[in-house]
Amino acid sequence: GMMHACGHDAHAVIGLGVAEVLMKIKDSLHGTVKLIFQPGEEGAKGARPIVAHGHLDDVDYFVGTHIAPTKGPDDGDVTPGTWGSLATSKYDVYFYGQSAHAGGFPENGRSAIVAAANAVVNLTAIPRHSGGISRVNVGVIRGGTGRDVIPDQCMMQIEVRGETTEINSYMDEQAKRICHAAADMVGCRLEMVPEGSSESQHSDE
């Protein structure tokens, strides 16, 4: 009875509806029409492979749409020139420390969870950008094997967003700096694996 309904079901229906209409009038069309259903949209990993595989090499015009949560299902409005989607960068962040017995030899340990916790607190403290919308989120954090073991590994899934590509770059740089500093503070090794990114877009007509 629950779903992540941010529009993908509606977008698929819109695309199929457009395909049905175009097939009915195909004899009056001149040129080629491509319908693109972007894979991996939630992780911002789908558009680049489409471009890299040449699917857009011969495309002259690109028309896209996105449903709006502010409109009801019966409004039937189409609004051009809306503000664009946020640019984003997404990372899997890995902290590697040193395991030790928390009761017997804590001085021998370097807690990956402590490093991650420092990162979480300070990521949320990144000053928001005065030039537009900026966002940061830690959506997943996992680590540790037992209450008496100083954990040698911890991972986080994080993302930053910005109203413009420049604002997102600001958030991205701050997030990287904070994660590296959090690891250094505890003596951990850090690995940040990019898991998707996209630039901002604005519709002007």
Q: What is each stretch, according to the model?
A:
Residues 113-205:
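Metal-dependent amide/peptide-bond hydrolase catalytic core
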Residues 17-30:
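Flexible, small-residue-rich helix->loop connector segments that border functional cores
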Residues 18-21, 53-54, 174, 178-182:
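Alpha-helical structural signal in soluble globular domains
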Residues 3, 9-10, 27-140, 145-149:
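Histidine/acidic-residue-rich, glycine-tolerant segments that coordinate divalent metal ions
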Residues 4-5, 106, 165-170:
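Ordered, soluble secondary-structure elements with a strong preference for glycine-centered loop motifs
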Residues 17, 45-49, 107, 170-173, ...:
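Generic recognition of short, well-ordered alpha-helical segments
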Residues 11-15:
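Alpha-helical transmembrane segments that form the membrane-embedded catalytic/substrate-binding core
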